[in-house]
């Protein structure tokens, strides 16, 4: 009986060891799979079809011709994309120098109108959620921006409040901007890289 108990215990321990090994391999495989998927999507944002300094876009967003990577990117960033004749989407994850947009840094977004019936600029945190703030201010659009005598605007993207055109940054991490242009002019819809997009200049960091 004692020998049988020892043998049985050894078998149980061996099965448990194999089970833990299997679970360990499965966990590593899952982590590698998720990590590689995120890397592919992040790489995709850096190699989009259209790139204008800090901004990236694609004429295939919202179309039946979008491949699985573009569809995954749209789902990840929650664009709820329409076709290019209805809306164009420009995303910025970096400033003019190619550096990631960081919460601890201040930026000035300087630009003019986009040829569209309506356009807006929205800030998101690194998880692509709206940034919580006491003013419930998440974006600016073409009608509520304070402009200079030439019709241009300057949005202040920072944690510290500004007197006007202030868009709050998150407390930590990276962030991004999305410019949406609804009912774009036909010429822009056919050549989305022709838009004069705003510059994103870093003015300092904490």
Label each residue range with its predicted role.
Residues 7-206:
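A compositional/structural signature for long, glycine/proline-rich flexible linkers
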């Amino acid at each position: 009986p004692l020998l049988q108990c020892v043998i049985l215990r050894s078998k149980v321990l061996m099965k448990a060891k194999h089970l833990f090994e299997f679970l360990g391999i499965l966990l590593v495989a899952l982590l590698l799979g998720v990590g590689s998927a995120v890397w592919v999507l992040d790489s995709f944002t850096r190699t989009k079809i259209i790139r204008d300094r800090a901004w990236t876009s694609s004429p295939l967003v919202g179309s039946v011709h979008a491949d699985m990577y573009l569809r995954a990117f749209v789902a990840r960033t929650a664009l709820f994309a329409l076709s290019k004749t209805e809306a164009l989407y420009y995303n910025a994850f970096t400033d003019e120098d190619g550096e990631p947009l960081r919460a601890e840094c201040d930026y000035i977004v300087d630009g003019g109108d986009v040829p569209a019936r309506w356009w807006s600029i929205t800030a998101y945190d690194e998880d692509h959620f709206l940034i919580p703030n006491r003013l419930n201010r998440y974006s600016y659009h073409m009608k509520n921006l304070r402009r200079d005598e030439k019709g241009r605007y300057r949005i202040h993207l920072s944690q510290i409040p500004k007197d006007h055109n202030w868009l709050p940054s998150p407390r930590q991490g990276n962030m991004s901007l999305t410019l949406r242009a609804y009912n774009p002019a036909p010429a822009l819809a056919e050549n989305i890289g022709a838009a004069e997009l705003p510059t994103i200049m870093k003015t300092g960091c904490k």
